[in-house]
Amino acid sequence: MRDKLTERFDRMMKVLFRQEGANLEIGILASEEAQDFIEAHSSVLNGSFRKVEMSETMRKRLERSNYVFSGLKTFHELNEAFPSLLDENGNRKTFERFLNDVRKIDETYNSNYLRAEFTFVQASAEMAAKWERFMQDGDRYYLQYRTAGDAKVRPTHAEMAGITLPASDPFWAEFYPPNGWGCRCSVVQVRKSKYPPTDHEEAMARGKSALEVDKKGMFRFNAGMEQKTMPDYNPYTIKRCKDCDMNNGNMKLVFVPENELCAACKLVRTLANADAKQIKKQAKPLQGTVITNNEFPFRFDKLIKS
């Protein structure tokens, strides 16, 4: 699959190389080549939970989440590759030199970062499937936070071990695992007669203390509750994305400001819902939109290590 991604990345770079002007056109995301790349990347993520049992509705929503995430990541890659079209003197490079110069982008995003993303999506999907089963029982049982119980457990995550609360407690909306890159924590149902509930305020305090390292608040989400593999605020978005109507499916109500990330996000979400011919028409007004958002990209390598 790595070779297929690189092959599609190269094809997408050919389309990027043909662009004229000083600004990256967001409409490139609707091109056949970009769509092939986004779908291939999304398919890799989907493969992480192919054997996980869940309802078809949940699976489709998680797969859609992967598509949106992959689309915004692709936007990032195009954004990073675009300046490499010109050499140090401002002259257009040959395609061979350009492709060689952007090869490190492919390696960084679609090998290094993808490994961490694959593991996170897999954990999110497994926990989303669990949440779906938990909801069938309502508050009949308590839910209890568990770590992997070995020497690799982060001390911060160990702070939450044993927290026991009803499924309806707001704690689970913020601190349901996975709680970071490579998090192996889980949640299980326990009998109310066997385990006393944790005080809500105490649980919230322990959760906030445990995730203090996540100062951006990226991992404060519940994959099962939101039916998404990745939080709306992730390395390829900005903080206010958490409260955007688009993330709640209200596409028609959204006012898209003069912001290239918002425009790209709306296009990607529309692409997830429509066929290519319709999208190519809708993408035309976005051509020429400038990509100059100072709020991203985050240093993803640092986030993985945190």
Cite the ranges covered by each PLM segment:
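A broad, low-specificity signal for short, low-complexity segments enriched in glycine/proline
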Residues: 42-45, 103-108, 141-151
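N-terminal leader/targeting and assembly helices and adjacent pre-domain segments
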Residues: 1-106, 191-306
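Internal glycine-rich, Lys/Arg-flanked active-site/core loops of soluble domains
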Residues: 87, 95-98, 103-139
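Conserved short secondary-structure elements within globular domains
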Residues: 121-195
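Sequence-level detector for tyrosine residue identity
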Residues: 67, 109, 113, 141-145, ...
